[in-house]
Amino acid sequence: MTALFTIRALDASNTDFLSHYKGTPYEDSQYRRGAQKIPGVVRCAYYDHGGEGVAYHDADAKNHGSGGLNPANGTYLNEFRMGEGVDISYTKFKLDPQIDDNPFEQVQPPANLLYVGWTEPGEWFNVTVDVAQAGDYTADLLYTSNRGGTISLDVNGEAATGPLTIASTFNASDPLAWRQWHHWSIAPGIAKVRLQAGKSVLTVHILTEGNMNLATLAFRRAK
């Protein structure tokens, strides 16, 4: 069961934070949309440019997904942000044995969806967003977590939620131990945040347990 936390009233414009922030919205040869839009789906793997200590903090400098689990072979997905510390992989379909289209998951994610993985407590990453209209927003998280745990969200450097409980996606029926990291689920309405119109920076913190794969946060206007 996921925990829904009450909106905190923030000065979400926080011009002091934004004026000093050195990160920039993610763009590359295939993604040129700049700041991710809210309402809409925020992709965790498109965290900001800026590097360690600015756009993210990771426990080590090695990307254990791009160029690691997914060998460097010149392809966009296998080498995505390969030189950065945030560990990234992507969903894989139609393989034997099945990986991210397996029968033990609660929802099936899109194929070739990039996600942040190998998470550990204390890690965080920033995503610059462009909010269409000021107001209260609810977020649904697409994720896996073989042990459960907690995350939290900041808006422009200020805490916007308390600890958000991530339910375990462990399924004892799966005979393949490594596939416990590929049981996808959605945490509906895991968080509510109050956002001002225009640019803001969201920070996703890994608080406890880790071993989560974080793919997307889908934001919609709260009812």
Q: How should each PLM-predicted stretch be described?
A:
Residues 5-223:
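Extracytoplasmic
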Residues 1-3:
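C-terminal catalytic histidine-bearing segment of alpha/beta-hydrolase fold enzymes
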